[in-house]
Amino acid sequence: GNEIPECGNKLDVQMGKKIADKIRSLDDTRYVTNSVNFVLSIQDRMGEIMAGMAAENTQEVQKKEEASGAEQQEINSMMTDFAAFMDRIVAGETAGKATEEAFGQVDIAGYNYAACRYESDREKYPDRIIVGSETTPQSLDMNWPLVEKYSNVIGDFSWTAWDYLGEAGIGKITYGEKKGMEFYAPYPYKAA
């Protein structure tokens, strides 16, 4: 799977195991992967996590949003603005615990925007094979040395944010008053 937010949920982790087992029963020659956005896997605890973060960082982002006058941002702007926050959230113990069981069911753990975990997870999960399944283009020069350094990290793939088939909602264009981030649009915006 890719960015399945429920991978941090006990019931859905059980379903993930059933799916992985079924895939292996059909073809045991291929690797089973799950590419996880750690932030999505703990989104139900985000308020609690954000409350624990340093107040000045939260205020800095709020000031930036107020200065731009934007109520909601485009996905690419949001990803850039929150890069520092995301690393802190992703590197946290809550994110690690939430994904531990889901990654234990697959052959290769896909880390979306989580290069900050490569070193610590190599120590904590020495048998885990990791791939940078989605990373930002501006991070490639920092991520590739990590791929070369850690033998359990087998590669790095950059998400280019270019329109392609497969990302639900990104083909939607809005006009008038409803401008802004409406990334998760309902049907018929299921494919770009």
Regions found by a protein language model. Give the residues of each.
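Extended substrate-binding grooves/exosites of carbohydrate-active enzymes
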Residues: 1-192
